[in-house]
């Protein structure tokens, strides 16, 4: 990871319901994987929430007899939560909006299956950033139990 190139003081931005999440993120159904944000701490950290329900399209094939939320979608949910940190940072600093592109995924581990009825918490923390590249470390938890973890790199591209 690159050393932190910015020395801004994080500002508590609070929470975001689904309407605010849709202002921060460009994703939409069926690929919006963050239902709400319970904490945004400036450009430092964020907790996103995903309520997993049986009526989501991936469960028609993954797996019909024993539905399991796909691990790749857990990683995408972590990436979207990290993206909310980037977008909130841009809004807070009145800078031009950016698209956030996933660039790297490292050290991914899936610990336990996630099933319909679970509420996933995505705990994302910025590790560092340099110019347009930001790096995050994240965990996905259900009822406080670690179900997945990853390190994610993202690039901000001005629109």
Curated annotation (Swiss-Prot):
A Gene Ontology biological process term: fatty acid biosynthetic process
Compartments where found: Cytoplasm
Record's GO cellular component terms: cytoplasm; membrane
Residue positions of the active site: 62
Disulphide bridges: none
Superkingdom per UniProt: Bacteria
Chief location of this protein within or outside the cell: cytoplasm
A single MF term (Gene Ontology): (3R)-hydroxyacyl-[acyl-carrier-protein] dehydratase activity
EC number(s) stated in the UniProt entry for this protein: 4.2.1.59
Top EC class, one word: lyase
Pfam family, one: FabA
Catalysed reaction equations from the record: a (3R)-hydroxyacyl-[ACP] = a (2E)-enoyl-[ACP] + H2O
Keyword Cytoplasm attached: yes
This protein's UniProt keywords: Cytoplasm, Lipid A biosynthesis, Lipid biosynthesis, Lipid metabolism, Lyase
NCBIfam families, A to Z: fabZ (TIGR01750), PRK00006.1 (NF000582)
Functional summary from the UniProt entry: Involved in unsaturated fatty acids biosynthesis. Catalyzes the dehydration of short chain beta-hydroxyacyl-ACPs and long chain saturated and unsaturated beta-hydroxyacyl-ACPs.
Family (UniProt): Belongs to the thioester dehydratase family. FabZ subfamily.
Protein name: 3-hydroxyacyl-[acyl-carrier-protein] dehydratase FabZ
Name of encoding gene: fabZ
């Amino acid at each position: 990871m690159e050393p932190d190139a910015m020395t801004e003081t994080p500002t508590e931005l609070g929470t975001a319901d689904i309407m605010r999440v849709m202002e921060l993120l460009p994703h939409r159904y069926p690929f919006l994987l963050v239902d709400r944000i319970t904490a945004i701490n400036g450009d430092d950290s964020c907790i996103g929430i995903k309520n997993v329900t049986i009526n989501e399209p991936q469960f028609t094939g993954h797996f019909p007899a024993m539905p399991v939320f796909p691990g790749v979608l857990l990683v995408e949910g972590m990436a979207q939560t990290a993206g909310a940190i980037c977008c909130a940072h841009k809004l807070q600093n009145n800078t031009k909006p950016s698209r956030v592109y996933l660039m790297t995924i490292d050290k991914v581990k899936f610990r336990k299956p996630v099933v319909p009825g679970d509420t996933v918490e995505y705990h994302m923390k910025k590790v560092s950033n340099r110019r347009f590249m930001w790096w995050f470390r994240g965990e996905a938890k259900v009822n406080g139990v670690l179900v997945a973890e990853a390190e994610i790199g993202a690039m901000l591209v001005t629109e």
